[in-house]
């Protein structure tokens, strides 16, 4: 088969013909095969739609999660081995204890920030902003993905010393993979780029991120509903459940293949008595636990938001964060690791345990103060005993109550300080462990008050402090994140459902306090970082129904009549840098007929140069006509009325992911509302002057 290439040379008026032979045998067979493959692709996409990509998303994230856990486990074991080999040399053990997390944290910060500054933190506040319709550049790029994976692995390898997790970053990582798979789907299927499809993939990705950390698909989907989206389409349930189930199943299956488990079991094993896990009078103490978690959650949210803002405002820390972020992270790691050194204050903080071991020990079904009083000779082993992790909380100088209280007080401010580090890190697992410690302290206190148990109907049942820890974990984490899905997460992660009613009660009570008094952890971060995210209207007391759009809209807008010429367009386009401009029927009626994009106006100016400025020869090449004839005017499919209330406008902005909307009165354009005006109106009503 041959192909003729024609090369034309204008100057010499010569034409050269080159005949190039291309070997393509069996043209008919090749044409038939290509046709059948195209039909197969169309059939598969018609049947499966985007299910293939959701399956791939779940499997990829499960592989990444397992690989990261495996790597972190080896790194932590190496650090533990090094501590053991150094023997009784306290100085070398101290240097080993602090240098390890300092090096990892500094490298995590430096590596991630050198690739992209958007890789720090959990990523959930930014993802919430993206799901609300705002475009944030480079937050979902593959470059950011690589920086976050390497940085997060180093962060987790620092161990429980830094007291950080991986849930938030994994939601962010899952969203990056989903965005990439979405672009791949567009190119493979030959579809146009659909923002709705992209939004659906990102919502499913949030569920996958949680499910591949805890192996909990149901709570992952509920997390994506509660935390990530202001409005959730029911059709996304199937996508979320399918992708999350695939991810959770593969993640748990890999643990079996790696001989970590004999079969698919709970991530955090418990051994509570199922036949009679709690007595009815204990519901009073469960309610108290919910109140305690709610109040401490409010204090934590306030202090965390204040410190995060203070670090950005303070001249010393802001200069350090601007010029040398790894140094700031190293200094914070030095402070925290020095405090948690096991030969010093760390012996009262169970600092030798990993995050998973901390949670498992707090869920222990023994009553610690009774066990220690009956076995006063118990002493901690030089090595961590995996069968008696709870002994790490025992100390001859402190009671169990003192150790737990000291842990809660110290971890409260150390974790708040760790959240200011500009490196990839998650903050859900720490608050989950912190809540378990609060619950354990309350449970041990109740067991001290009723050492024989609470009698009901002549039957005395002992108090199980581990059950209180199991309720405190979802209650406190739910209070901090303003979610109820943490209750279901506790059920799925432990395989325990005996305390279902007390857990839900604790979570609801704790949420009642924090939702009334403080924004959630993620919303607070959005506020401090000043991300373009609409605040929620949480109370009807601010009279959002009584405020009309006319009261907070921006009446100063640039409009173009349909018959606008060169001078009119030039005047408007130089007066503002808007991306689009409203077009009216004429200057007298001001009836809105559509919008025109800024690039079209620039092209209009380039092709319709002013005849007054053009020379005699240039006038012949100029196009004639006005704006309506030369530009494509897009119709306005949505607009607000001056009588639309603030509450209705806010609801529509969230539901339709709007960035701005024009305001009309009897068809005449009178102003526009952007997210800036909406946010200011809500803040003015919530905080009247």
Swiss-Prot record:
Record's keyword annotation contains Ion transport: yes
GO molecular function, one term: voltage-gated chloride channel activity
Membrane spanning stretches: 52-83, 92-112, 142-161, 162-181, 237-256, 283-311, 326-343, 402-422, 423-442, 502-522
Record PTM text: N-glycosylated on a single asparagine, probably Asn-365 or Asn-375.
GO cellular component, as recorded: chloride channel complex; plasma membrane
Residues listed as glycosylation sites in the UniProt record: 194
Positions annotated to bind Ca(2+): 260, 262, 279, 282
InterPro entries attached to this UniProt entry: CBS_dom (IPR000644), CBS_dom_sf (IPR046342), Cl-channel_core (IPR014743), Cl_channel-K (IPR002250), Cl_channel_volt-gated (IPR050970), ClC (IPR001807)
Binding-site list for chloride: 122, 428
Subcellular location: Cell membrane
Keywords: Calcium, CBS domain, Cell membrane, Chloride, Chloride channel, Glycoprotein, Ion channel, Ion transport, Membrane, Metal-binding, Repeat, Transmembrane, Transmembrane helix, Transport, Voltage-gated channel
Protein name per its UniProtKB record: Chloride channel protein ClC-Kb
UniProt gene name: clcnkb
